[in-house]
Amino acid sequence: MSEQVKRVRVTQVGSPIGRKPGQKETLIGLGLHRMNASRELAATPETLGRIRKVKHLLKVEELS
């Protein structure tokens, strides 16, 4: 029996210019390289931690 992994869509809505270097690196780690870029990611604890670190720069939507 396989459990279906929850997914989230993250969209970059804020610029990393003038932010701490770690925040820019976190955006790159999430696969976001420019404004309004979106990615669908698995909602693992690691991914959710990264999202929490830069939540002020992202729009997050839960997918079914």
Curated annotation (Swiss-Prot):
Molecular function (Gene Ontology), one example: structural constituent of ribosome
UniProt keyword annotations, A-Z: Ribonucleoprotein, Ribosomal protein
Region called Disordered, residue ranges: 1-22
Highest taxon in the source lineage: Bacteria
One term under GO cellular component: cytosolic large ribosomal subunit
Assembly and binders: Part of the 50S ribosomal subunit.
Family annotation (HAMAP family): Ribosomal_uL30_B (MF_01371_B)
Database matches in PANTHER family: LARGE RIBOSOMAL SUBUNIT PROTEIN UL30M, MITOCHONDRIAL RIBOSOMAL PROTEIN L30
Protein name, per record: Large ribosomal subunit protein uL30
Species this chain originates from: Acidiphilium cryptum (strain JF-5)
Gene from which this protein is expressed: rpmD
